[in-house]
Amino acid sequence: MIYREQYEWDSEKEALNIRKHGLDFDTAILVFEDENYIEWYDAAHSATEDRYNVLGMVHDVLFVVYTERRDRIRIISARLATNQERRLYFHDYHS
């Protein structure tokens, strides 16, 4: 179950994300309800803070980037998964 108070994000960043990817962050946090979601540390983008990538199913496979701040999950970006990411999700899900 998603508790909204566990999550946070910058509203301007969300507005940019909606314009660019058509996806709001209230929808993005639903990836964490997918019992088959895949998560990994993103070393390449973690110079200033630890970032994580998540693939999860919310009507379609979504790719979400987040960090942890003050015991909350802070959403950085969200979009539909690429074809390669979808293959990774379905391969891991069915393995």
Task: Locate each region found by the language model.
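Ribonuclease/tRNase effector modules and their secretory precursors
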Residues: 1-95
